[in-house]
Structures are given as C-alpha cells and as structure tokens.
Amino acid sequence: PIFGQAQYAQIPMAVVGIVMKFFQIVISVAIGMAAGCIPIVGYNMGAGHCGRVKKLFALLLGAEAFVGVLSLLIVEGFPGQLIAVFGASGESVYYTEFAVRAFRVYLCMIVLACINKAAFIFLQAMGRAFASTLLSMIREVVFGVGLALLLPPFFGLNGVLYSMPVADVLTFFASVVVIGFTWRFLRRDDVA
C-alpha cells in the first residue's frame, strides 16, 4: 500500500489527528448538553420526581441524537470542505482520499458516541457513579484501546479506523443494559 512508503507515512497520522479534533468538538457539545442536566437530575432525584428524570433523559437522548445526526450529515455530505477547514487544502490526492475515508469510517457511529456520553453523564447525575465510570472505562480502555490493538493485525490501517465505531456500538449495547437495569430501581409513581 501507498502508506508503507516513507514519503506517505505521515498521512495517516495527520489525518487521524484531524478526525480526532472534529470528534472532540462534537463530543464537547454532547458533554456540555449532558452536563447541563446534572443539577436538574440531582434535584428531581432528591425530590423523588422520577417521572421527570425519565422525561429529561428522553429529551437529552433526542438532543444528543440530533447533534450526532447533524455531525454525521456534515461528515458524509461535505468531507472535502471539512478537511479544508483543518488546513489540508494543498495536500496530495492520497491525503485527501484517505482523509475522506477516515472521516466517514471513524465517525460513522458518532450518533451512538453522543448518546453514550449522555448515558454516562446521566448515570453520574443519578448517583450511579460506579456504573457511569465502568461504562466509560469499558468504552475507552477495553473497547477503544483493545480494538485499536486487536483489529490492525487482521485489517491493517482499516482496523484502526473501524476500532472506534465498533467500540461505540458495543458500548451502546452495554449502556442500554445498564440504563434498563437502573430504570427498574426508579419508582414508577411520581410525586408531582
């Protein structure tokens, strides 16, 4: 492959840095929205308004999904322009082709990444810090790092790109299980 040649070896590193920067911007928005719910969740949990907590969680998931879908549409619809924003307008054809592929593959599950962050922070706000920390560590360390190390020997550079979307999908399923289990312990009767 072309990236095995010395003059092109820096391309994957530069591209992954750009992709990670865009990912961090989107995730920062997702974290900000979820963090804004923390005092509201804490108050309503303390006051016994579990119905409100469930409604807020549904609203938050909808907002996070919207941010994720909007980001995905930008990545899928305008990859060249997105790459140019990060100062890569005069690069080689190999750079541009790889950057477009990297954006589309690495960020194909950004909707789930946003939802996962919301679930982690919401669990923390509900007083379930252990579950929140466990899910976060599973996503970042077990799935994120683990898949980034396991997939490349079998899939090469594509293994690195697919590691995060696969981690997001696996973490999403784990989050669904933990949230479902947590909901069982919330009282069905609402005080207000």
What are these regions (language model features)?
Residues 15-73, 77-79, 113-135:
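Small-residue-rich hydrophobic transmembrane alpha-helices
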